[in-house]
Structure formats: structure tokens, C-alpha cells
Amino acid sequence: CHYIFNTC
């Protein structure tokens, strides 16, 4: 998951 874009 990506913490900036909030996607996995």
C-alpha cells in the first residue's frame, strides 16, 4: 500500500 495516495 502507498501511504500518500492511499492505495494498495
Swiss-Prot record:
Q: What is its main location?
A: secreted
Q: Which UniProt keywords apply?
A: Secreted
UniProt note on tissues of expression: Expressed by the skin glands.
Which locations, inside or outside the cell, does it occupy?
Answer: Secreted
Pull one GO CC term from this UniProt entry. Answer: extracellular region
Protein name, please? Skin secreted peptide 4
